[in-house]
Amino acid sequence: MENATHPVPLIELRDIRKRYGGNGTPEVEVLKGVSLSIHAGEFVAIVGASGSGKSTLMNILGCLDRPSSGSYHFAGHDVAELDSDEQAWLRREAFGFVFQGYHLIPSASAQENVEMPAIYAGIPASERHTRARALLERLGLAERTANRPHQLSGGQQQRVSIARALMNGGHIILADEPTGALDSHSGAEVMALLDELASQGHVVILITHDRDVAARAKRIIEVRDGEIVSDSANDERPAQPSAGVERHLQADDLSQRLAEGSSEPSGAWRAELLEAVRAAWRVMWINRFRTALTLLGIIIGVASVVVMLAVGEGSKRQVMAQMGAFGSNIIYLSGYSPNPRAPMGIVSSDDVAAIATLPQVKKVMPVNGGELVVRYGNIDYHAYVGGNNTDFPEILNWPVAEGSYFTERDEDAATTVAVIGYKVRKKLFGSANPIGRYILIENVPFQVIGVLAEKGSSSGDKDADNRIAIPYSAASIRLFGTRNPEYVIIAAADAQRVHQAERAIDQLMLRLHRGQRDYELTNNAAMIQAEAKTQNTLSLMLGSIAAISLLVGGIGVMNIMLMTVRERTREIGIRMATGARQGDILRQFLTEAAMLSVVGGLAGIALALCIGGVLLLGQVAVAFSLSAIVGAFSCALVTGLVFGFMPARKAAQLDPVAALASQ
């Protein structure tokens, strides 16, 4: 039915058809060539029995669904040419939905439900709050703003739904069976509200099967079996179109408003982010147990990575410090077999004497030693016994903590005296004073004259404190039966020129051994570098193993998000109906995945620090690094976002009509 006063319809449908099925399933045509026009200010009732196609028609009118064929023009613009974001703009700015089932988000308060369209419109929070409270007060719900839907009666929930429809103006109210789930009194109140809105100039399109309800409209369109069978004015309710609303929705300015509105509204991202964070927190709190189980995977993953790397770094620093304590100018010389069938090379006393003459060398100390049984009283203990000269404390930077070191006189006389390591002292003497006591080394009595300062492990699990130093001459004569050293420790004259000293020793040894390289030279700096590389590899391996648990935590995030999308499908439909774009829904659920990851990551870091404290109490070397903590947290966040993307994308691609119809 055309209105001569308004030649350009606000809504115009021409030969609209809607089919379902196909692709191997039976095809059903729900709408069969529907054509109608609706002008600004009209109060229209679309009436029909269940299954007549009236709800499908409403979904197409409200841009929740697209027709299979035909044309739909809104204010002179072809809706088929609008993309999904532009149609979302129409739902947000032009339409307001009032559903039979209310379609309120259960976890949000009445005010938060009303504010939702304004959030996606980018309206500032203070203005949103004021407008939402004013609407609720206008509809008699001033005392119910903080109530959740389950705390409201059916009539109150429907009034919240109407307030939400009006939040962004609600120029066109689409009411689908608004009284269907209400008692007669509440239904009458809702219809009175719709009458009032129509009198104020809003376009009201009422979908109902009840002819008494339809009689409240100024125009009644009857739909039967997907076709319009009648379209007539209700003479008892004459039309009173509102010029104000029509001016607001003129076709001439719609293109500009669509171009402005379909892009990101100013300030919308902040409002949406805060809403996403609040929604995520509500969902996490409501499903506390399930959330805790999901967070547990992330917490364990982050804590594992941080602790493993901290233990690896602590071990590395400890070993490096202990190796460095022996001096970076140290060079080691020992015999070597150039091939499996050749005899082991021998470093002789003459070699030692020749090396001592080199200008690049500061000190030379031959060592003749091995792992031997040491006895004190009834205690037998295995320790490394090394025959050294008097330069031992200076070369290895290893002072004597108790007593004294042996002298040149002891060396010349092959005196059986011993300076024991810190660990040997603890094992054999405990807290007793060892100075002056005698120990048996391979049944040879040696008098303890000193105790070396504690040094710790030099590399791997070798404990440098598990040793005994005796005069080189005594070791050669009394214990090992040879004057040739097991190996030689050489201190370079300049710590910055260790490699030059090593080359000079190499050239000398080649001459002395007639070109035969039956010896091996290593320096402490190279050993430190090699050990550092080994420790880095170990740390990487530990971190990789721990990262697997972080990956498992990410899979947990994906599982919980898929479950969340399935459980909140109707909420997604509600958000789309109130103007959320696909990008808004995507950000909503990505934010929730990020929230899970952030909370889990922070809790994992806290747990890691607690574990580190316990390990430190147990004398385990632990060194937390900011880069490891930030890296683990970042990995948790990225993992959560990566694994949360698929569920978020699935949510964003849901069909609004199917989402609203889900249980």
From Swiss-Prot:
Lipid bilayer topology: Multi-pass membrane protein
Any one of the GO CC terms: plasma membrane
One Pfam family recorded for the sequence: ABC_tran
EC numbers, comma separated: 7.6.2.-
Matching SUPFAM superfamilies: P-loop containing nucleoside triphosphate hydrolases
Binding residues for ATP: 48-55
GO molecular function: ATP binding; ATP hydrolysis activity; transmembrane transporter activity
InterPro entries hit by this protein: AAA+_ATPase, ABC3_permease_C, ABC_transporter-like_ATP-bd, ABC_transporter-like_CS, MacB-like_ATP-bd, MacB_PCD, Macrolide_Exporter_MacB, P-loop_NTPase
Compartments reported by the entry: Cell inner membrane
PROSITE patterns registered for this protein in UniProt: ABC_TRANSPORTER_1, ABC_TRANSPORTER_2, MACB
Residue ranges of the TM segments: 292-312, 545-565, 598-618, 626-646
Keywords: ATP-binding, Cell inner membrane, Cell membrane, Membrane, Nucleotide-binding, Translocase, Transmembrane, Transmembrane helix, Transport
Domain ABC transporter, chain residue ranges per copy: 11-250
Family: Belongs to the ABC transporter superfamily. Macrolide exporter (TC 3.A.1.122) family.
Biological role stated in the UniProt entry: Part of the tripartite efflux system PvdRT-OpmQ required for the secretion into the extracellular milieu of the siderophore pyoverdine (PVD), which is involved in iron acquisition. This subunit binds PVD and drives its secretion by hydrolyzing ATP. The system is responsible for export of newly synthesized PVD after the final steps of biosynthesis have taken place in the periplasm.
PANTHER family linked: MACROLIDE EXPORT ATP-BINDING_PERMEASE PROTEIN MACB, MEMBRANE COMPONENT OF TRANSPORTER-RELATED
Oligomeric form and interacting partners: Part of the tripartite efflux system PvdRT-OpmQ, which is composed of an inner membrane component with both ATPase and permease domains, PvdT, a periplasmic membrane fusion protein, PvdR, and an outer membrane component, OpmQ.
Protein name listed in UniProt: Pyoverdine export ATP-binding/permease protein PvdT
Organism: Pseudomonas aeruginosa (strain UCBPP-PA14)
Encoding gene (name): pvdT
